Amino acid sequence: MDKLINLNTYPVSENLKALLKDKTTKKNIIFATSVYSSKGTPIKETEQMTEEILKGFTQYEIQPRVLKNKEQQQERTKAKAEVFTPSWICNKMNNHCDEEWFGRKNVFNTEQEQGWLVNTEKVGFDTEDGWKKYVDSKRLEITCGEAPYIVSRYDAATGELLEIRQRIGILDRKLRVVNENTVNETEWFKWVLRAYQSVYGYEFQGDSLLIARINLLITFVDYMQDRWGRVPTDAELRKIVNVIVWNLWQMDGISGTIPFGKPKEEYHQFSLFDFVVADEPEKQDTEEPEEVYCRIYDWRSDKSLTYKSMKEGLSLIHISEPTRRRGIS
């Protein structure tokens, strides 16, 4: 099976540095998994993911779960309850969300046994600006993994690549609506950007989060090439990547904080007073990691806020049915 993710080719290689950023800590996301601890130079769970470290990996190490060996899959399932979610299940749950939003069934496709038949007619809305409200409607995929509910470049259970017209992710549906209701590149990009600003997801494990971010980036390139027959400009890519990095973030879903507390400084300039006196016993570092609440961005209000504050009272994000199915209320 061919690689589904390649860190060394367009558009990932040109944007990898930005894709590794953590908007809360202003550093990089961390690995938050022990699966790489057996490498020549062991990688700790708290290690920041950097371009330098990733360049030392083989091309098959940062790949979706379906391409990992059985031992790795079992280890990740045991450690973090990571599982496959087939596309037909994602489609079923996303259809349920859309049925609630539209007030009718089978808006984008008709479900079949472990599959679906795409409805090719233009999606209808009750009002002239109804499509804009749909694009702006906020959705959150909790513990998103590779983000199969948001975008469906491939079936997470089989690795099969899906054609654009067969895709069933939340964002895929919004991009279809944008395609059907815009007539020029300027308007199209404006509403594609808003579609990206409307979908959110968080994940604990850094490698899965990176894959999710890459999936959203490649999805943008796919739709641009399909609609306009060109690749995005650097400026367009920067805008999309900035939204992706804000909206797909690393978090411990139970505490609402970054995994393992505040990250340690990568470098410290020593002074005379940093050296331990010969006969003085070295103090043990017994301090608990400082909790840092994760920040997200409300694009319509143009401000950042903590996920915790949003969850406790601000109705900024509609938590979709797939997230409740996965054990989160």
Language-model regions, residue ranges each:
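Residue-level detector of conserved catalytic or cofactor/ligand-binding positions
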Residues: 314-328
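C-terminal tail/extension regions appended to the core domain(s) of diverse proteins
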Residues: 293, 301-304, 308-316
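Conserved S-adenosyl-L-methionine
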Residues: 92, 101-257
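Intrinsically disordered, low-complexity, charge-dense segments enriched in Lys/Arg
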Residues: 246, 260-262, 272
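Basic, amphipathic N-terminal segments
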Residues: 265-291, 296-297, 304
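Intrinsic-disorder/low-complexity loop/linker signature
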Residues: 26, 159, 175, 180, ...
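Preference for the N-terminal adenyl/adenosyl cofactor-binding alpha/beta module
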Residues: 1-151, 207, 254
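Short linear, low-complexity motifs centered on an aromatic residue
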Residues: 107-108, 262-268
